[in-house]
UniProtKB/Swiss-Prot annotation:
Tree of life domain: Eukaryota
Repressor among keywords: no
UniProt-annotated binding residues for a protein: Q310
Molecular function as annotated in GO: ATP binding; metal ion binding; protein-glycine ligase activity; protein-glycine ligase activity, elongating
Annotated site, Essential for specifying elongation versus initiation step of the polyglycylase activity, chain positions: Q310
Positions bound to Mg(2+) 1: D489, E502
Cofactor(s) required, per the database record: Mg(2+)
Protein name as annotated: Protein polyglycylase TTLL10
Amino acid sequence: MPLHPPARRPHGHRRNGSEAQTEATTQDTGRLSCPRRVGAAVCPIQGLGHRAARRPRRGVGTTSASRAPRPGALMPATRNRPRFIHYRVQPPRTHVSFKRPKRSRTHQSHTKVPGWTHEKRMGSSVEEGLRPELSQLEQDADNLGEEEAARLPVTSLNGLLMEGDRHPNPGQGPFFYIGGTNGASIISNYCESKGWQRTQDSRCEDYKLKWCEIKCRDNYCSFREGQQLLFQLPNNKLLTTKIGLLSALREHARTLSKARLMPSTQAKVLKMDEFFPETYRLDIRDERQAFFTLFDETQMWICKPTASNQGKGIFLIRSQEEAAALQAKTQSIEDDPIYRKMPFRAPQARVVQRYVQNPLLLDGKKFDVRSYMLIACAMPYMVFFGHGYARLTLSLYNPHSSDLSGHLTNQFMQKKSPLYMLLKDSTVWSMEHLNRYINDKFRKSKGLPRDWVFTTFTKRMQQIMSHCFLAVKSKLECKLGYFDLIGCDFLIDENFKVWLLEMNSNPALHTNCEVLKEVIPGVVMETLDLALETCQKSLHSQKMLPLQSQRRFVLLYNGETTDLWPRLGSSRPPIRLPYANSNHARSTCEISSSSLTSTRVTIADRPAARKSMSSRTAPICASRKSRLSDSGGVSIEESETSVCSGLPEGSRDAAREPSLGPTEEEREEEQRSTSHRGS
C-alpha cells in the first residue's frame, strides 16, 4: 500500500496490525534517509503539527501499569500503522536512537498525551545517575543489527528508572557537598579521609555534610535535623553584620540595665562602651543626625556597609567637607520617592564607627587579631573559642594617609600592593610570635604580666565573645546539626585596651602564607570533629563532656548544664537543673549561687526549637519564677535568664546574662537591622 508523503500523512493514518511491518521511509529530498530507530513510538496527536507527523518511528513503547497493558504490549490498531501507548513513568531520556552520521544520542521526550505528567526537574539526581547507564544502552544499540535493535528490551530501561527513584545518588555514600572555594581542599580532604564521597549537585538532599559560603533558603528547608550537618546558622547575621551586632549589643545593654543585680555582680558585667567603639546607624534618621551634630575634625570616623567583607565599601571621614558630603548623599537618597518604597532601605544600610587612632604597632605597622568563635552544636549550645593569627599591614602606619591599605589589615587589601608576593609572609604572625614580641618590647615598659597574649588578652577575647553570644542566644535559630565558625577581629590600642571591631561569617580559610598553613587546617579539622562528636552525643542523649576531639579550642558555653533544651524526638524537654551535689568543676564563668539574684526561667520562645512542655515541667518553672520575683529579680517568661560575670583566671566556660523581651519599638528596629543579607 503506498505511503502518504510525510508532510501530508493524515493523523489518523494507521497500518493494519495483522500485516507485517515494513520499514518507514522518508520522502524529504532535503534529508538523507535515516537508519531504523529504537525507542518509544509517539502516538500521532492532533495539535502537534506537521513536525510530529514527519517522525515515523518504530520501537517499543511503555504504558502505565494501572491504565495500560504490560510493557511492550501492542494496543488494538486499525489500518496500516501500529499504535503504542506510553507508560506513565518519569519521561526523561527514554528514547535511544541514532543521529546522522552514525552518532548516538538520547532524545528528551516532550510527548503530551492525556494524563501524562511532567514532574521531573532538570538536573535531578535521578537523571544524573542514569547518564552512564543510558550511554551504555546507546552503545549497545549501535552495535546491534536492525533485527536485534528492534527487539531491544525496554524493561531494562524501565527498571533503571525505577532504581534511580530509589537511589537518587550513584555510589554508596555518605556524601558531602562544598559550595565555593574557601577552604574547599581542607574540607574535602577531611571528608574523604572518612570515606565520604563528594557530590557536585547543589540540590542533593542525601548528604552528611554541606558547607556553603553563601546561605540558601533551600538548604534549610530540606535539612534533616539530627541526620545532617549544615554549615552556618540561618540567622547568624545577628552577629556577623554591623547593624545586627550593634542592635544585639544595645538591646543586651538595656536588658542588663533593667536587671536588678547585686553590686558585686553588676561590676563584673561587661559594658558595651568598654570593648565596642562608638557607632551610629545611617539608616535611622535620629542616629544619623546625632552623628553629624557631634562630628568634629579632631576625630576620625570610618564608614562601613553593614553586610560586606574584604574592606569593600569602606571609607574614612576626617574633614567637615567629607561629613557634609555624606550627609547630603544620605539625605538625597532618603528623599528619593523610589527609596521610600523600598522595604528595607538597603542603600542606607551603613554604620559610622569611631576610628581607634592610637593602635598598638608592631614594627611601626598596624595590626589586628583574628580569632574564632565556634558554635559546634545548637541543641544544646556548645560554643568554643579558638586562637587564630595576627594580621599586619605592609606599609607603616600613618593616621593622615588616605590609602586604606595602611588602615585595613585584611589580606584582600594587602594583595593590592605590588610588594605583596615578596612580603606576604610578613603580613601574618602566629600568636606565639606576637606573644614573644610583646614580651620583649612592652612587658617591662608597660608593666604587663608575662605571656600577656595568652593570659590577659586571651581572657578578654573570651569575655567579649561570650557577651556577644549571650546577646543573641535566645534569637538564634537552632536545630541539631547546625554549626558555625565565625571570625572575630580584635584591635589592641597603645594602652593595651582590647576592642572588638567586627564579626564575620564564612571567615577566610585560605593558606597562602606559611603561618596560615599551620593554623587554618587545624581550625577547620577540629571544627568538623567537634561538630560531628557533639551532634552524635546530643542525638544519643549522651553527656557532652569530655570531648575526645577537643584539642586547641576552649569551651566558652555549655548549654547542656545551663539551658532547658529539648532532646530530638522527645515529647517534652528534659528538666535540667544547675549543678547539685556534684563534684564537677563549675563553669568558671558562672557566679556563685549566693551572689545570684536571677536564674534561668524557661525556654518558651527559642526560635526553631521544639516548644512543647509537659505539665511536669510547668510547676518547676513556676517555682523558679516565684523565687526570682521574691528575691527582687526580674521575672522573665519569653527567654532564658542568665547572669554574666567577668571571666576569672583560667576561664573555660561562658558567662550567663539576662535577656529581656524587646519592646515594640525595638522589634521594629530589629526587623530593619536583620533584614539584610549576612556578609
